[in-house]
Amino acid sequence: MLTAEFHPFTVVPGLRRLFLDYCSSAAAARPFYASLPSDEHWRTRPPVPAHWPQFVQLLAEQNQTPSPAAAAALEALRGGAGVIVTGQQVGLFGGPLFTPFKAATALARARQATAAGAPHAAIFWLATEDHDFAEINHVVFPARRELRTLTYATAPETSQPVGGIVLDDSITPLVEQAGELLGASDAMDALAAAWRPGHTFAEAFRQFYAKAFAAQGLLVLDAAGREFHCMGAPVLRAALERADELHQALVGRNRELEEAGYHAQVAVEPQSSLLFLIDERTGARLALKRHPASAQEPDGLWQAGRQRFSTADLLGILASEPERISPSALLRPIFQDYLLSTSAIIGGPAEVAYYAQSAVLYERILGRVTPALARFSATLVEPAIGELLRRHGLTLEKVFGESTALLAHGLAAQAIPEEGKQRLAAAGAALEAELGPLTGWMKSLDAGLGRSAETAASKMRYQMSRLRRLAANFQLQREARLGRDAEAISQAIYPGGGLQERLHGAAYYFARHGFELAEEITAEAGNPRPGHTALWL
């Protein structure tokens, strides 16, 4: 049984102001979003599109032999239930911990809407068209006193969509290494069954998460194929035929964000477009760049690699080979929500930020903007680490933002014998008691003398701080366990100077705590307040 401890997002270092204002439902963020966390109209299902029966049939074909809960979700969709969607790149062995947090949030929101009388199901969108292999080819698992990185090294020859990469025999020793780190468990069995030679990254990822969230009824979708691109062709066609209009809308939105004191998550360059082209010969995913209209080409030109195309050329490809036209990060949510008729989309801090940009595309292409909801964010505190935190009187807020060295120094300062603490405190207090009146008196005599006095006083305060550091460093040398404790806490709670959810592989926690963890995080992910939760396992 876990214990949840809620914290506002302000305890997390490095989050951008736009995301924080969105989470607090600040008035300044409202112009950029269809819905803020304080709103509830995300539960309203958009109109059922004409392609819905075909879409649900294709979804069912990808979710063959569903669990009872997934079969019930499919049946609800056939009856017109709404969709809460989330998604992620298809990372090795299930990717980082925030991946199941996304799935859990979509499931929790679908449950809430259904309980309120608006039936919904959760769909996990596999970002299989992404071509950043270096982002998905590795996973990090905690090991004894270290973090171990497992890497699938067989890179494709071109920057092709990662979902279609077929696993070769080199995956087998990686699975064996994962087994040594994770130990025997249902999760390890599921991982080994999914990640095997002959499977694609997409198939392996889908199979693992369908198993992990079988009891909750998660449906998994790969929309990279011809049928889905044909179904979503109106969105891709708009991005071709109205490229200049949509580009200017994005430029204008970026300007509005910057004028409001925010940042633009995705840069919009003069020649950038909303589309990629899959090369028919190599399979590489190439950015389509836009060249302005000219006397010779009144509709402008497009360029992918060294090849140039007219708009008519690309419309021809869309008609005959729609799977070769691929949406960018800013267009993908619109393409996705056209297919799914989405009620709400779940995203992390960066995604919520770029939804503020995509909103202008939603308005112009779909005529509506899908509400965005922040995913569940958490740190899982295992029993041994929880004991260390309690022993040293540490909270998440005290650990976040601290390097291992600074954390160790803090533990050592706490461990200084009481007599030493009292003497250091007394010396510091006495110094401050004398310096204040002295520098004030010297300043009253002469301004220049006062400035010199402040400089000298600052140096004296520095030396006092140095005495504290010397005492703490001596204590750290005497008690080596303090350094080991600091290292263990850092690797578990704030590894590599970042949140645990962004680095640790999710499979590690499923292996240690069972697939029952999926239900536990789904239950916690229903909290309507955006924030960061410590889950004490």
Roles of regions detected by a PLM:
Residues 1-65, 87:
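N-terminal leader/transition segments
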Residues 269-343, 349-360, 369, 376, ...:
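A translation/RNA-centric and nucleic-acid-associated enzymatic feature enriched
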